[in-house]
Amino acid sequence: MDFMNFFILGADLPTLGGVKGWASDVVIQFITIVVMFIAAKNLMKLKMGGIIFVCCIGSAVTWVIKHWSEFSGWINALMEKL
């Protein structure tokens, strides 16, 4: 049994926190790619307002993903006020 514990610990398998961080990074990278694509599409049409709007929405969504606990606290406080 000790050998199995040594084997599992030696494999350096990711923990649940590591998997959660990895998934968060993948989602943020996907959002970045989508924002760059839509911004390039608006650039071809010379729509500066569209580029600025897409960058603002993309950065807001990225911030919410990175700071989910703070954002959910704000939503919870807002729901309690109502």
Swiss-Prot record:
Q: What domain of life?
A: Bacteria
Any transmembrane segments, and where?
22-39, 46-65
- What does the entry list under GO cellular component? plasma membrane
Membrane topology is: Multi-pass membrane protein
Which keywords fit this entry according to its UniProt record?
Cell membrane, Membrane, Transmembrane, Transmembrane helix
Compartment(s) where it occurs, according to its Swiss-Prot or TrEMBL record: Cell membrane
Looking at the keywords, is Transmembrane present?
A: yes
What is the protein name given in its UniProt record? Uncharacterized protein YddC
Q: Which organism is it from?
A: Bacillus subtilis (strain 168)
